[in-house]
Amino acid sequence: MHLSEITHPNQLHGLTVRQLEEIARQIREKHLQTIAASGGHLGPGLGVVELTLALYQTLDLDRDKVVWDVGHQAYPHKLITGRYNEFHTLRQKDGVAGYLKRSENVFDHFGAGHASTSISAALGMALARDAKGEEFKCVAVIGDGALTGGMALEAINHAGHLPDTNLMVVLNDNEMSISPNVGAISRYLNKVRLSDPVQFLTDNLEEQVKHLPFLGDSLTPEMERLKDSMKRLAVSKVGAVIEELGFKYFGPVDGHNLEELIRTFKQAHKAKGPTLVHVATVKGKGYAIAEKDQVGYHAQKPFDLATGKAFPSKKPTPPSYSKVFAHALTTLAENNPKIVGITAAMATGTGLDKLQQRLPKQYIDVGIAEQHAVTLAAGLACEGMRPVVAIYSTFLQRAYDQIIHDVCIQKLPVFFCLDRAGIVGADGPTHQGMYDIAYLRLIPNIVLMAPKDEAELQRMLVTGIEYTDGAIAMRYPRGSGIGAPLMEDGWEPLPIGKGEILRNGDDILLIGYGAMVHSTLQVAEILSEHGISATVINARFVKPLDSELIAPLAKQIGKVATFEEGCLMGGFGSAVCEALQDHDVLVPVKRFGIGDVLVDHATPAESKAAHGLTPAQMAESIRAAFFQKDAAKTTTTV
């Protein structure tokens, strides 16, 4: 059977181990070819190929439900659930999503993008099943670092107190999340993974028993059971901790041995109550380059399969915002031992790995534990340290109560640096950084700022480090800067709450925030081609907003447009409208941003075009709204 013929996972039933191994080979081949061509998550999926095939062969997927954590480890799942022929569209507009979506496929039982959600969701399904008197299996596959998240541990705590609720948790233990796992839980799991002596004993047990006089051949049929028993005996002390939590423990099992996996899953399915199957896997399995560099090949841009190297850009690009941030923070930290960089398992993505390498004592990785990261930072601030929480905008949502309760109510000087703010592209709605302006703006005792370019980011970083009158947050986008000239050091802080005028005009006031300032200037240039002169403001701060600058100009000019890369509801444009009303300036305002919709996976350029955020689209919209007679004469295209 060829992988392309599998449209339903139940087609795996009855296949021999050798046939499954061939399917596994084809999955890895398709997986590698696709990611090499279009980019995406590489290592996680390669590590769970055998796990997926073995698990699905022991389930009836017409009834049973499997909930995958995070989602980027579920590419093999996608390939055996009817998406083989469309898999080449992975992470592309209108193509297969990079994560799990209930709307995409009947076998995607729960959407996943953020970590540590699977056990809670699967337990909820199991409880609903029992309440309705139905019978089917509920399985949560968690791993790639997600077990370090507090939510997963809360779910384990709950499930362990439900001895009559059948729930299977499959732990994909590859010793990694995106970066190497940290913390006591990771150390514990490493102890549970088979040690070399135990592995040697079980691997050689069968050969030794064959040489026993009279008994060798007769014991051979029981050998696998005996080997399993010896493994369980070897890990009984550490595995007992899981059983103390109320789970029946199976493992650890070799995550790339199909026979062992199938046998273990069958045994675990017979158990009553919550069970945990501990599967030891290798991230990037089957692609030697990814196995050697598991951090670097967690996700990849399009690359050459033969060398593993990313294809070079067609033209030189400016450094990314993340890279500029990392360099500036490390430079500042070298001269200020109170600066501490904090990441929640995203050292490489945020650039904090540079700080880790240079100043390891001023670096903390808490694992996938955003709530803990924020309150840890609050504690550091209490003792006079300067904590810098570098985190993706979408992940800070997970620590909202801690921002309010532990930081802002106590007016503690914690500096939040929000990477991937705005449209992020192919990762889709679970990772778009749309909401931070709105959800942070309403909290007292926090300052919000966003740089117009990478050079201004350097100055804002100094501003945030020096600000001590409460919390402060800086948002910045994914990807390259605009090519603004950078200084190596000597950056000057910005005055809090003050914007700047970048261009003067008489017909309309254009106010940009953050990465949209560059587009705002482009809009002004397009409007000028039609005889419309615009004043352009770089707001810099949304809280406090520079009302002293904005209100008089809005009153004088009489027409206003705002530009942001985030949700309109409660966002920057809303802040401007509120400020104008507070100053009794009643003028028409046109807001540009993301409406009350989710932004699906596509390139950033495609997403901006889909939401009317290209400079040409915005200029045309302004002309239609404020200068209708002029707009009717000509049109502008890009």
UniProtKB/Swiss-Prot annotation:
Reaction equations catalysed: D-glyceraldehyde 3-phosphate + pyruvate + H(+) = 1-deoxy-D-xylulose 5-phosphate + CO2
Pathway: Metabolic intermediate biosynthesis; 1-deoxy-D-xylulose 5-phosphate biosynthesis; 1-deoxy-D-xylulose 5-phosphate from D-glyceraldehyde 3-phosphate and pyruvate: step 1/1
Binding site residues for Mg(2+): 144, 174
GO cellular component term, pick one: cytosol
PROSITE patterns: TRANSKETOLASE_1 (PS00801), TRANSKETOLASE_2 (PS00802)
GO molecular function, one term: 1-deoxy-D-xylulose-5-phosphate synthase activity
Cofactor mode of binding and number, as noted: Binds 1 Mg(2+) ion per subunit.
Pfam family, one: DXP_synthase_N
Co-factor requirement: Mg(2+); thiamine diphosphate
Any single biological process term in GO: thiamine biosynthetic process
Binding site for thiamine diphosphate: 72, 113-115, 145-146, 174, 287, 370
EC number(s) stated in the UniProt entry for this protein: 2.2.1.7
Highest rank taxon of the organism: Bacteria
Transmembrane portions of the chain: none
Key words, A-Z: Isoprene biosynthesis, Magnesium, Metal-binding, Thiamine biosynthesis, Thiamine pyrophosphate, Transferase
The keyword Hydrolase is annotated on this UniProt entry: no
PANTHER family: 1-D-DEOXYXYLULOSE 5-PHOSPHATE SYNTHASE-RELATED, 1-DEOXY-D-XYLULOSE-5-PHOSPHATE SYNTHASE, CHLOROPLASTIC
Family, as annotated: Belongs to the transketolase family. DXPS subfamily.
Physiological role: Catalyzes the acyloin condensation reaction between C atoms 2 and 3 of pyruvate and glyceraldehyde 3-phosphate to yield 1-deoxy-D-xylulose-5-phosphate (DXP).
SUBUNIT field: Homodimer.
Protein name: 1-deoxy-D-xylulose-5-phosphate synthase
Organism: Picosynechococcus sp. (strain ATCC 27264 / PCC 7002 / PR-6)
